[in-house]
Amino acid sequence: MIYSKYQAVLVIGFTILSTLKLLKSVRFWLAGIFALLILIPHFHWQLANDFPSFQYHLVDRSEGFKLGCLLEYLPNQLAVFNPLTIGAAVYIMFKNKPSGQFERTLYLQIAGFIIFFFFIAFRGHVEPHWTIACSVPLIVILTQKCRTDPRILRYTRKFILPTLLLFIAARIFTLTDIKFIRHLAFGGKEQEYRELESEAGDLPVVFSGAFQRPSMYSFFTGKEAVAISSLYSRQTQFDIWQFEKKYNNNPAFVCINPLGNSAIYASDTIKFGGYRTDSLQTVNRIKISYDIKQKDFHPGDEVNVDYIMTNPYDFNIDFNHRHFPVSLNIVLVKGKELYLVDVNQENQVTMIRAGETVSGTIHAVIPVLDEGKYSFGLSLNNAFGPSLNSRFIKIIIRKDD
């Protein structure tokens, strides 16, 4: 269950809270120990990859409080569970006390999930389906009540069942190839990616940003594709797989926004920017550590940063690459706003050889920005955008007195 979704931890936790006597059961503890043993490969994978799942959910997804995220939470839950269904379940829970231990657990599962993710909405967007685990206790409660309460049974037959039929009809409708459905992004994707394939040929296709496009390209064409993440997007499983390593210094088709060498390819179904390169270069795996003593700045202040840059690749990184030049920048992030600050290097880096580590000092000037806390880091910027190469620390920018 945990292998499928981490929300399973909540299912287990709420079950224990509703049935504390489980903690006295030897069989309960044996089952828990056995489950942990089964999870050892997953824990090892997390450790080996710097806990990407936890980093993604606990750090990367955290957007801070946004009223919109809070206001959309309950409407999204109504849409997921069907307002008529969850409305009936809530009515049953308020009108009837749980009749036994099993029903008490069902009640707590439903209430626990809804309340827990309501509070999560204070720190960012909650995907509507995250609470789907409580649909099982919801259905069980409603089914049990239909057996004993004729009013609930009539309500279910009159209102809930027709909505289920509408849902099934809508699902069938989305499987059709109607043009209107294709424009809603429910289908018709194969032709788009086939046209992209006709331009790329047998070259691997390199996308920027999210994982969806390379995944669909590989699915529909059976050919290789990869996503290169940047600070403008979240990291994906492609950052763990690191397929791009085998494409470096080799020909590839780069599918990114129309900048520099990109040409615009357009047809009736798709429009995209891209170009062929005979030598791909990416820098996402370059590691940068740095030391900054001052963490309180005003606009116009000079910042001096000592850094160490390591190239873990088995090939050189050319900062003056003809297609993918690289620049070292300071990055300042506040909310969704990202600012790249140009730097001056005491000893300009033009090449980092395979496995090499270089060090130096950079100087920059804090730009005129709004007062507040910013995340500070160093990044290598190239055609795919600024990459995640260093840790980020908090600094404060204050207005001049």
Each language-model region and where it sits:
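Short periplasmic/luminal acceptor-recognition loop of GT-C membrane glycosyltransferases, typified by
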Residues: E199-Q235, F319-V333, E346, G377-S379, ...
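Periplasmic/luminal catalytic loop of GT-C fold multi-pass membrane glycosyltransferases
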Residues: D239-R285, I308, V368-E371
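Membrane-proximal, lumen/periplasm-facing interface regions of secretory-pathway glyco-
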Residues: P128, L153-D202, A210-L231, C255, ...
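Short amphipathic, basic-aromatic surface patches that mediate peripheral association
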Residues: M309-N320
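Short, solvent-exposed, Trp/other aromatic-anchored flexible loops in extracytoplasmic proteins
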Residues: L340-G385
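Transmembrane-lumen/periplasm boundary regions of multi-pass, lipid-linked membrane glycan transferases
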Residues: V11-F102, I115
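Hydrophobic/aromatic-rich transmembrane helices and adjacent perimembrane loops
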Residues: G124-R151
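Transmembrane-helix signature of polytopic, lipid-linked glycan biosynthesis machinery
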Residues: I2, L108-E127
